[in-house]
């Protein structure tokens, strides 16, 4: 039996983050365009070669200088009129779309399905026009590196329009126009003698109407005339449309067999067409735990009843974009944990090992096979994976969702203690992380006293600046934190932190998701010392800053041997202990950030309620012991909350800040009259280097007051300030305070 191997996509970042370094050096002017393109070409060469060592077929077109959705939009001429004509190869124009320029707002950014990757939302043009076949250019480059192994990847036209927030008849109308353009792209790629053309259509695993399906089917009936199309799905199953997909005249179908458990059953129940290839996503592209190879061997062998081996390609469940590059870059992980991990390069090795075992028998690869199984078992047998005291404490919670005193009764108690003005100003939490700060953190273990002095000096600096600017509710700036999840993970038992486990969040922004390897609990205070020190420097209230249980879960690689709801409850209890200690230290406002709350939603609405129930419960486990006079804040990112407003209200936070600056108030229009707690929608976009003017901020505040009474509105940036410079922060926050004073005067 001859099984081929591939993956849906591969990480862009590289070991040591050469991707990030090249981008940021180019943006800062330290690298010219020639040098930048040379650095990117070297990175692309290396990632192609790495894949070709293990795989039979290498995806090409998944790489991007910022975001693959943006690349597709530019290729199709979907450039907002405010930017004028942008040539597909013009780097300045390309990055202006992503980051804004000269007062022009960037494209809106939001979460890519239910992941922590961000994409730029396409704006529909008046007229579609194919600018350049950018994937064809990547294929020609790749064929010089890996030869016939190169196969192209396109973001499918139907999912592209769904990502642009089109639906129903409007989607069908635009899809007709795009189909002709995609047909040309497919023809040109097919002429390169590629094995097949992967068209990513992950939106099929969400809710799809009959009208939308008909538009999809018509598109692919046409595209299949022009090349060998494999419709690639991921992040779930396609069971509602499985039989219809099998009837399409496409070359093959890519299915997620990890998250999409029901896809296995669909194949077994309905069979699989003998004229198509199956790209079977059998290794996890989203989580880092080693595959259970023995189980996969049995399952894949069973697939041979339905799919001949020559038509079966072993692959990842989704793009490996969500994984770090390699476990071999880690030097300090406990062996009991590292033995159970598989990052992107290890996933390639798993696929190669599986294919060899299936082709020649396990005996042919016995030593490697046995070592892989033993490594996984070493983690399962590890100390700390199960902690009886933690299991007992979570069991004692029962099944009820804990509650505080009613919001209406808490408000006067909080105002009496805090005495805040109308339209109180604050920031979301983080302040710029300077080079000196990063250097001090890197040297912390060698010089802990010097590090503590640096942190306290930075906190004092941040407090003094905020007082100087006239901010009402202060933050300590989080100088001790490398990342809002990573910091807490490094101080909670059950978590382990990687050194080189970087994954792309958006553009050059990379994060290191920690790994939840065992039961989670707090062994000591997490943030009390820094917050209490900040409060000692000012009479204004300082917010305690914590990361909520759902975000701690969503932005981590979570153990796969315990339900996510159970892990979230464990984190909630650890945070409850921290809230109690912050109150005891005199902190009267505590913010528990949940920027990832919405991204945890399953992609089909029928599955939402179960998630929302346990997510709300985990948050309230963390907050329910807080005093009524303690004001609980939360913060959420890039989200459309209108359809989950009941769950947001059920969190029972006193104040919520949301990332709405790029959405022109559309979110608030849906919340009008449906949410009674206080809201800070974000008055400017921190992801853009553009500095808002006082006039722009006044206009934004007036817009917000069309939807919210002044008593309900808070004034703040739309996210943390960690990625900005102090010069940018000073200019923006001073303008924000000035604008707030003007609006207050107008109201009074």
UniProtKB/Swiss-Prot annotation:
InterPro entries: Cbl-indep_Met_Synth_N, Cobalamin-indep_Met_synthase, Met_Synth_C/arc, UROD/MetE-like_sf. L-homocysteine binds at residues 428-430, 478, 593. 5-methyltetrahydropteroyltri-L-glutamate binds at residues 111, 509-510, 555, 599. It is an enzyme of class 2 (transferase). GO terms for biological process: methionine biosynthetic process; methylation. The keyword Cytoplasm does not apply. Its cofactor is Zn(2+). One of its GO terms (molecular function) is zinc ion binding. L-methionine binds at residues 428-430, 478, 593. Its EC number is 2.1.1.14. Gene3D superfamilies: 3.20.20.210. Pathway: Amino-acid biosynthesis; L-methionine biosynthesis via de novo pathway; L-methionine from L-homocysteine (MetE route): step 1/1. Zn(2+) binds at residues 635, 637, 659, 719. The active site is at residue 687. Keywords: Amino-acid biosynthesis, Metal-binding, Methionine biosynthesis, Methyltransferase, Repeat, Transferase, Zinc. PANTHER family: 5-METHYLTETRAHYDROPTEROYLTRIGLUTAMATE--HOMOCYSTEINE METHYLTRANSFERASE. Belongs to the vitamin-B12 independent methionine synthase family. Catalyzes the transfer of a methyl group from 5-methyltetrahydrofolate to homocysteine resulting in methionine formation. This is 5-methyltetrahydropteroyltriglutamate--homocysteine methyltransferase. The gene is metE.
